[in-house]
Amino acid sequence: MYIIRCICLWMILGLMACSGPVRIQKNLEVKPEIFPDYADVTIPPNIAPLNFKLKDACAEARAILECGPEKLEIKTGKDACFVIPASGWKRLLRAASGNHLNVTVQAFVNDEWIAYAPFIIKVAKEPVDGWLAYRLIEPGYELWNRMGIYQRNLENYTENAIIENKMSGNNCMNCHSFCMQNPEKMLFHMRETYSCTLLIDGDKVEKLNTKTDQTLSPLVYPSWHPSGKYVAFSVNKTKQAFHMNDRNRVEVFDSASDVVVYDTQKHEIVTSPLLSSEGAFETFPTFSPDGNTLYFCSAKSRTMPKEYDQVRYDLCSVSFDPATRRFGTVVDLSLIHISE
């Protein structure tokens, strides 16, 4: 009896896997509407399967992915999604590296099989770093106290927590940043309970109190210097307000902000009047790849929140000497200048 059951099972699986091509009654000139829209995008050769869903209603659908002799046919499964098997996907990407995949979607609509115009997915030769770190939080302000910093393997979508705020009194944690994508050298902020900035360098962990009498707030938005010796930060007086009638109910704004640079070795903060003026909101600093230029955004200061809709940020830059920690004497306002 056991042998008969096994034979029946294998026959069923074989029929499902070898259902064969369908007879197409109509070929469309339009590409299918899919979600997410992967048509004509470029992907790295080590990305996890790009599962997608056909937006048009249909009783059944198939997708044929191919590159040269490599071919993969899949049918829609639960929730009308195309779930691409990992092994077949990897074979396709190896074959398509530096080239592209052809994707043809067929659907059974109104008692006939139709074929959409094919689309392509370009495959680069160069792989990407296989890990992505991000903060995960509910998309509303009500549940802000449930959050964590997570990492995801982009090659298979495995996700695990770096730290969750249930470990620290459900406080806010944010602005995690890695030095040149080095997972051994990073920082992030803890707010309210256990308020601090945690600076991690290998096995060394420093807990920093970054509020000073000379700065507006503890350090906020970070950008590592490529040397790892410095981190540029904004310091912000940030507030939240609620609109009565606007569709965007929540407005988060700065009433003041400056830019500073933190020396991780000397534990000192340096700045310049060009980066910390009362007449402007300076924020969002970013070091250039060579570390000799500091980019930042700057807007003329306004009375907030009354004039929130009049704030216009320019993209600016100033030179920075890593050896002396000195800034240039002139700010370049020509990058993107939209303020009055």
Question: Where are the language model's segments positioned?
Answer:
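Beta-propeller blade signature
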Residues: 150-152, 200-203, 251-265, 311-322
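Low-complexity, Pro/Ser/Thr- and charge-rich linker/hinge segments at domain boundaries
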Residues: 34, 113-141, 214-215
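Residue-level detector of Asp-centered blade-edge/turn motifs that repeat once per structural unit
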Residues: 180-182, 226-227, 289-290
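Conserved, compact domain cores that house catalytic/ligand-binding motifs in diverse enzymes
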Residues: 133-208
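Short, conserved, GDST-rich strand-edge loop motifs in beta-rich repeat architectures
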Residues: 132-143, 233-254, 296-313
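Conserved small/polar residues in nucleotide/adenosyl-binding loops
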Residues: 336-340
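C-terminal motif of bacterial Sec signal peptides marking the signal peptidase cleavage site
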Residues: 16-17
